């Protein structure tokens, strides 16, 4: 039996695969496939699926430290990266891009990831550094 602190629903079309699991501060996102005709459209939809999964935990893309990208055609790498760069900021995450012979649902791109949920630490740092009347930090300080 797997012991996860949290899991984010089942992956569409499956009965036994979670979209994301978290154990401790670490999380793992199952592959999210793209939709659309072009590699750009597929990249955007795949990333938006990743963003949706992350939002179930209150997380954002900057919490992902490593992506693995599966491309049906490695010649799409440059077009993928030109689209992907619009979603990530410095410091950029690690990323491995590999070519595969086939993907589910005739997708040309699939993206999975792993990361660290730092929300608890961010909140603690905010509370410990508060030196005002707490109006700007939501009243979470004591």
Residue map of PLM features:
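N-terminal presequence-like segments and the immediate start of the first folded domain
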Residues: 1-62, 71-142
